[in-house]
Amino acid sequence: YLMLQLLETLGLKALEIPTDPRTGMSVEALELASRQGGIAACLIVSNGSNPLGCVMPDERKRQLASLTAARGIAVIEDDIYGDLHLGNERPWPIKAFDQAGNVMLCASFSKSLTPSLRIGFVAAGRYRSAIALQKTLTSGATNPITQHVLAEYLESGAYERHLRGLRRCYGQQVEAMRLAVARHFPAATRITQPQAGYVLWVELPDSIDTTRLYDRAIGENVAYVPGELFSPSGMYRNCLRLNCGNPHTPEIEDAVRRLGSIFSAP
């Protein structure tokens, strides 16, 4: 949702493409939209889409790479959650199926290690020169000391060991939050089963407005992200995103209970 605000400040328009909570962005819907023209770029999180947590199947990624290359649509792929997959194997990014250098693969270590490193990377394909120029103009050089420290850490194998433990913790925390929501939220509530990352997308009955109830939740010292913020057209007012990035303590369980009471009140 912060990306929507950034696009707005740049004077760009965002077109919503339907997304399946299990298989990700609809390639068919993107293809239909591209027939109308005017689409310059496709911004996508194919692994651990925020807020759904879904991972696109490889065949869908291959189709998207082929379609966008044929239509001249640049792909900006944010793979920041790829290392935080909750399955047995790390999913491939769309970039792996890019035959035309049309995909700009971006990621960082802010979610898997710490945001204080301020280190990310981009495999920019045909856009490499333009991206390098923009990097120089906007932020100049990156601290070489932290880059070398991180490089040695990655080469040592410690990062992979760290990821195994982190994925296990996130998987447990996501499942604990899912069970808590199922216990305390209104009947007919629907909850995603994330395949990567550490957020839950919760769909409440249509009569519940999570934007309107947000201030009441803050008054109970409970925070969430209203679903409306993930849509430039104001959809998903009956939905919300929950963060599972912290251990599921009794305090968090009680916060979920209080939130469920707010949503269940007449």
Question: Over which residues does each language-model region extend?
Answer:
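PLP-dependent class I/II
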Residues: 1-266
